């Protein structure tokens, strides 16, 4: 299949609307403001999920780290919404682009590191040299710890990109195989279609899990620097 070289730079659309608008509006549609005195079951489940996620991520933080609560909740909702919208047919998944994921990972990582150097300068510098290190190994360990620090945003972005891209490729390949097998063997095509359905369900779980993992790792980086 031939594609335009610059197709990845065009604004992705869905039903004629820019997908950015749908991504921004998706959390507000999924989690509307309650207008009842007593919440219904759906609203109660939504609030329980938000409280559970907040508790998992913020229980390890002190007061300084808990000021990032709104940022972390917004981040997991944004990534989760983007991943789920990307599973719709004929849609574009922005989180398959390494440039976008780096654009999220680098500022968040840099913010946690700057916070650590501002409020815990000695403790942040101490991470570069573990206590009790032999004198001949000091230069090597400082270099290794520095490299590991700068690899963190790359690991965040590559993990999210690789998992989402791999899932979409598998769905595309198995879907194409199902269409090709329909003219050859109906039974084999049906079995492949069942596998495709199961893989799609798995991708829904992966979309949410990857959003949680990305946000959790940012939360852990923040915990190390506050």
From Swiss-Prot:
- Is Ion transport set as a keyword in this record? yes
Q: How does it sit in the membrane?
A: Multi-pass membrane protein
Return one GO MF term: proton-transporting ATP synthase activity, rotational mechanism
A cellular component term from Gene Ontology for this protein is: proton-transporting ATP synthase complex
Question: Which superkingdom does the taxonomy of this entry point to?
Answer: Eukaryota
Q: What keywords were assigned to this record?
A: ATP synthesis, CF(0), Hydrogen ion transport, Ion transport, Membrane, Mitochondrion, Mitochondrion inner membrane, Transmembrane, Transmembrane helix, Transport
Q: Where are the transmembrane segments?
A: 12-32, 68-88, 97-117, 138-158, 164-184, 189-209
SUPFAM superfamilies noted in UniProt = F1F0 ATP synthase subunit A
What is catalysed by this protein? H(+)(in) = H(+)(out)
InterPro entries the record matches: ATP_synth_F0_asu, ATP_synth_F0_asu_AS, ATP_synth_F0_asu_bact/mt, F0_ATP_A_sf
Q: What Gene3D superfamilies has UniProt attached to this entry? A: ATP synthase, F0 complex, subunit A
| One Gene Ontology biological process | proton motive force-driven ATP synthesis
Q: Where in the cell is it found?
A: Mitochondrion inner membrane
Family affiliation? Belongs to the ATPase A chain family.
Q: How does it assemble?
A: Component of the ATP synthase complex composed at least of ATP5F1A/subunit alpha, ATP5F1B/subunit beta, ATP5MC1/subunit c (homooctomer), MT-ATP6/subunit a, MT-ATP8/subunit 8, ATP5ME/subunit e, ATP5MF/subunit f, ATP5MG/subunit g, ATP5MK/subunit k, ATP5MJ/subunit j, ATP5F1C/subunit gamma, ATP5F1D/subunit delta, ATP5F1E/subunit epsilon, ATP5PF/subunit F6, ATP5PB/subunit b, ATP5PD/subunit d, ATP5PO/subunit OSCP.
Q: Which NCBIfam families match?
A: ATP_synt_6_or_A
Summarize the protein's role: Subunit a, of the mitochondrial membrane ATP synthase complex (F(1)F(0) ATP synthase or Complex V) that produces ATP from ADP in the presence of a proton gradient across the membrane which is generated by electron transport complexes of the respiratory chain. ATP synthase complex consist of a soluble F(1) head domain - the catalytic core - and a membrane F(1) domain - the membrane proton channel. These two domains are linked by a central stalk rotating inside the F(1) region and a stationary peripheral stalk.
Q: What is this protein called?
A: ATP synthase F(0) complex subunit a
**Record organism:** Halichoerus grypus
